[in-house]
Curated annotation (Swiss-Prot):
Transmembrane feature ranges: none
One Pfam match: DUF1414
Entry-linked InterPro entries: UPF0352, YejL_sf
Family statement drawn from the similarity comment of this UniProt entry: Belongs to the UPF0352 family.
Family annotation (SUPFAM superfamilies): YejL-like (SSF158651)
Species this chain originates from: Escherichia fergusonii (strain ATCC 35469 / DSM 13698 / CCUG 18766 / IAM 14443 / JCM 21226 / LMG 7866 / NBRC 102419 / NCTC 12128 / CDC 0568-73)
HAMAP family: UPF0352 (MF_00816)
Domain of life per record: Bacteria
Protein name: UPF0352 protein YejL
Length: 75
């Protein structure tokens, strides 16, 4: 079942495009890109979420990430 969001697809796609442009500008390989994005998520959780909620948010994020991964072997 798709998740409802308070953000429009346009808002999400615009921000995603800008972030991808930064990674491409720096010619960041996949492993570096994942490291940077992971550090960004960690920083957002640690600085924007109440300590009592951090673990639950991290678990929810991890589950959402895992459920969005495509098992198609093609890149």
């Amino acid at each position: 079942m798709p998740q409802l969001s308070r953000y429009s697809d346009e808002q999400v796609e615009q921000l995603l495009g800008e972030m991808l442009n930064v990674l491409e500008k720096h010619k960041a390989p996949t492993d570096l890109s994942l490291m940077v994005l992971g550090n960004m998520v960690t920083n957002l959780i640690n600085t924007s979420i109440a300590p009592a909620q951090r673990q639950a948010i991290a678990n929810s994020f991890a589950r959402a990430l895992q459920s969005s991964i495509n098992d198609d072997p093609a890149h």
